Amino acid sequence: MGYISNNNLINYLPLSTTQPPLLLTHCDINGNDHHQLITASSGEHDIDERKNNIPAAATLRWNPTPEQITTLEELYRSGTRTPTTEQIQQIASKLRKYGRIEGKNVFYWFQNHKARERLKRRRREGGAIIKPHKDVKDSSSGGHRVDQTKLCPSFPHTNRPQPQHELDPASYNKDNNANNEDHGTTEESDQRASEVGKYATWRNLVTWSITQQPEEINIDENVNGEEEETRDNRTLNLFPVREYQEKTGRLIEKTKACNYCYYYEFMPLKN
């Protein structure tokens, strides 16, 4: 009695190259069991059908074609800035022959185009206000010098000749170094002369103050005990007068008496 070896048993068994089918069991309302056999190939087919059922418009953006852009720009240049709902539908229906487009795409294109035009206009106006500095070529140095625009107006009384050291600093420094040696000896003599002049002026002021008589000042004491300083009013004496003072207590009264010897009286003429 012979036995079949394991190797011979494996050779007799058929080999399956496909995946085993899946058996799904579900129960309905009546309680009956239903069996459904699903294979791997049928599952892949169901996935492909689900992908095809997804709408393409929900996943794609609007990519305008050159023909659509050209048509929209022509409409904008012709005067269309904010189209109405009917105009948007008409424009979209005309542009669909060049590619996919919707009404909202037309509306947003006009809005964005107007915003870009406003931004460009503001940049041009801002560039016109702010002007760059002019580069003026300097013939003496051979380079360029930047001249800044004057913001304040010039007045006639402020226009004065510019000093030489401001016009040409190099030449002024050379002349200044040469003149310092010549003026070195004269500075001491000028200083001595100024001191002598100051001393003479001071001596004249002292002499003048001594020779001048101080003005007579009357100090009267009022009822409240306050002191007032009053000075004599200087008047032009047309006729010679004689002055005398009368002292009465603390008060000093000055009176002026007229000299009647020099008094003249003019009488009217008789016809």
UniProtKB/Swiss-Prot annotation:
DNA-binding annotation, residue ranges on this chain: 57-121
One GO term describing the cellular component: primary endosperm nucleus
Q: Does the keyword Transcription regulation apply?
A: yes
Q: Which InterPro entries match?
A: HD, Homeodomain-like_sf, WUSCHEL-like
Q: Can you name one GO molecular function term for this protein?
A: DNA binding
Alphabetically list the UniProt keywords: Developmental protein, Differentiation, DNA-binding, Homeobox, Nucleus, Oogenesis, Transcription, Transcription regulation
Region spans: Disordered: 118-195
Q: Does the keyword Cytoplasm apply?
A: no
Tell me the domain of life. Eukaryota
Tell me one Pfam family matched here.
Answer: Homeodomain
Q: Which residues form a coiled coil?
A: none
- Which terms does the UniProt entry file under GO BP? cell differentiation; cell division; embryo sac morphogenesis; floral organ development; leaf development; leaf morphogenesis; petal morphogenesis; plant ovule morphogenesis
Expression tissues: Highly expressed in developing ovules. Present in developing primordia and differentiating organs but absent in mature organs.
Q: What does this protein do?
A: Transcription factor that plays a central role in ovule patterning by regulating cell proliferation of the maternal integuments and differentiation of the maegaspore mother cell (MCC). Involved in AGAMOUS (AG) repression in leaves.
Q: What is the protein named?
A: WUSCHEL-related homeobox 6
Q: Which organism is it from?
A: Arabidopsis thaliana
